């Protein structure tokens, strides 16, 4: 354990076993407190421990908001880890004690504060569309945002009885920026004549009009204005034929006013960058991999726009010099957590661990659903939650096997939100290295699915294969 802590583990009303012996073997030096219903009937036990000033790790994430309220009263240092869906709710729960101990120990590894950059939005919004649907969306937002509607094909568009927001015509030729700082270039730009009667009639048009806005709502039905459009903060896109999707985008746009703290996902040391010297281009890895085009050449090095960066981490994973480093968490902290997870699992009696790397929104949700509606994870599948699976580089994969992993699986979406070329390149580089040290076969692979039951079907096969290899000559 990184420091002496009190571990609170709960059987959740006897729906999962608690292997006390495994916790004692794996979490030496920690005070282990077990319960049956710590969030309700035994809540005062939790409160008294928090008042005592103990550092506490609670094996429950479902009731974390309640426990945080109590911790705030006493200023207690508390962290949380999911051992129920990750281990306890499983067809192999009886053998999951070592995994539970490993998950709790890894959760106690101290995490550094997340660095942030601030984004300001004054609520100036442009609704870009092709017909009345854009006007309807603008009308829903007019009381909340400073709205302008830009229509690409304003044929037979009824003039409003009262001009409550500007309606102009034009086609966006180019767009750049992000929440609070969009810049668009519009061709065929024109304003309507105030004398328009049966339909809006527009004045003389011009190309190259420039406009700035904080929020860009795109209901044009055309191609996205940005690469990896779903990752561009402040750019909301919906199919104009899907009223529910348009309404959802409107509701999201309404909330994008004020100051926002965005994580600074990547740290960058320009002096280490090998992009260019004497006007001769050397390394382009990050430029070629960035899905949002947040990276651009800047002389002998590159520059990363932290407000556009969506945090995929492929630049840091591919950087050959360490100029770009991932910050959520930094690589050395992730290594400590990985080492703790695998060594405690072994110390607690676990064998043949399969490291299951996943993000929270997708992989975490699949694991949760598999536990609730399927057989749960195998006892030797150790989930490691990271910010983005694509942040994983060769050093993490090598460390996982060095610390004792029998296999590594990376959970990905069936339809990724951005190109995964960087991750695939890392896997292709790692495979011959693993084979060279005798780790051949399906040691490293992705599981690309949005179906929790498909995840469940993939993992037991992996578990059986790795166990059979370990038992072989």
Where are the regions a protein language model picked out?
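Active-site phosphate/pyrophosphate-binding segments
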Residues: 308
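Residue-level detector of anion-binding/catalytic polar loops
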Residues: 77, 147, 325, 406-407
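C-terminal, active-site-flanking charged/polar segments
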Residues: 393, 399-410, 416-437
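Short, structured secondary-structure boundary patches
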Residues: 167-169, 338-342, 347-350, 426-434
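Flanking helices and flexible, charged tails adjoining ferredoxin-like Fe-S electron-transfer domains
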Residues: 118, 249-252, 271, 275, ...
């Amino acid at each position: 354990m990184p420091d002496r802590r009190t571990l609170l583990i709960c059987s959740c009303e006897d729906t999962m076993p608690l292997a006390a012996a495994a916790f004692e073997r794996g979490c030496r030096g920690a005070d282990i407190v077990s319960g049956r219903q710590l969030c309700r009937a035994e809540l005062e036990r939790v409160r008294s421990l928090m008042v005592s000033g103990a550092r506490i790790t609670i094996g429950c994430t479902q009731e974390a908001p309640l426990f945080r309220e109590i911790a705030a009263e006493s200023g207690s240092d508390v962290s949380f880890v999911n051992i129920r869906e990750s281990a306890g709710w499983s067809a192999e729960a009886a053998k999951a004690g070592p995994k539970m101990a490993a998950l709790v120990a890894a959760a106690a590894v101290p995490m550094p504060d997340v660095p942030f950059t601030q984004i300001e939005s004054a609520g100036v919004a442009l609704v870009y569309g092709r017909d009345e649907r854009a006007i309807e969306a603008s009308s829903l937002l007019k009381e909340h945002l400073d709205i302008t509607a830009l229509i690409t094909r304003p044929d037979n568009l009824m003039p409003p009885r009262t001009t409550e927001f500007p309606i102009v015509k034009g086609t966006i030729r180019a767009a750049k920026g992000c929440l609070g700082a969009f810049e668009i270039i519009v061709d065929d730009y024109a304003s309507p004549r105030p004398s328009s009667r049966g339909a809006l009639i527009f004045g003389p048009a011009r190309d190259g009009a420039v406009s700035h806005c904080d929020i860009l709502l795109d209901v044009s039905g055309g191609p996205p204005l940005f690469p990896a459009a779903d990752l561009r903060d402040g750019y909301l896109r919906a199919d104009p034929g899907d009223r529910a999707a348009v309404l959802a985008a409107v509701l999201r746009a309404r909330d994008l006013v004020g100051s926002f703290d965005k994580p600074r996902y990547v740290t960058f040391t320009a002096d280490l960058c090998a992009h260019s010297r004497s006007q001769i281009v050397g390394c382009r890895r990050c430029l070629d991999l960035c899905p949002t085009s947040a990276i651009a050449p800047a002389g002998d090095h590159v520059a990363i726009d932290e407000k556009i960066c969506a945090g995929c981490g492929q630049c840091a994973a591919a950087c050959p010099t360490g100029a770009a480093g991932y910050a959520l968490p930094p690589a050395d902290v992730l290594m400590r957590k990985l080492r703790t997870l695998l060594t405690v699992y072994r110390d607690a009696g676990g064998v043949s661990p399969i490291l299951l790397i996943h993000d929270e929104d997708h992989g975490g949700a699949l694991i949760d659903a598999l536990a609730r509606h399927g057989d749960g994870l195998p006892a030797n599948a150790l989930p490691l939650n990271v910010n983005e699976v694509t942040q994983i580089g060769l050093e993490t994969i090598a460390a996982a096997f060095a610390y004792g992993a029998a296999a590594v699986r990376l959970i990905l979406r069936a339809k990724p939100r951005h190109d995964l070329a960087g991750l695939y390149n890392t896997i292709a580089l790692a495979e011959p290295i693993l084979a060279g040290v005798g780790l051949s076969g399906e040691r490293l692979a992705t599981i690309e699915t949005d179906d929790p039951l498909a995840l469940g079907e993939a993992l037991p096969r992996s578990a059986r294969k790795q166990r059979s290899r370990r038992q072989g000559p």
